[in-house]
Amino acid sequence: MINLGGREVNARAYVSKFNFSGTDQEKKCGVLSGGERNRLHLALALKEDANVLLLDEPTNDIDVNTLRALEEGLENFAGCAVVVSHDRWFLDRIATHILAFEGDSKVVYFEGSYSEYEESKRKRLGDVTPKRIRYKKLIG
């Protein structure tokens, strides 16, 4: 049993959420693949009793089951999770506050989901969807 956010959880059940089942749960860390190590690090980080968790593109190269476990872990995380991600759907499911860099490095703080932030941004700035740039040949 492990302590997870103040409640006792079966350790094998916990790591199985990160796609470690059966004999995978008995592997030594040194023989894990890169993807398995990433899943292990996520599982360990989410179970720590930390105040702040920094995640840089946490949804890159993870499977759907691990993504769901990550979302659940972040929802139950008692501290502050700072997440840098381009995955808008993931952000919409987990974010409660947004710190965004807009335009010429203007920093905007917003309380709410990512969808609510996007709607607010559209109201404030209009349609600022990036446009394809056409380059003009300067030399002959």
Residue ranges and their predicted role:
Residues 1-140:
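ABC ATP-binding cassette signature C-motif
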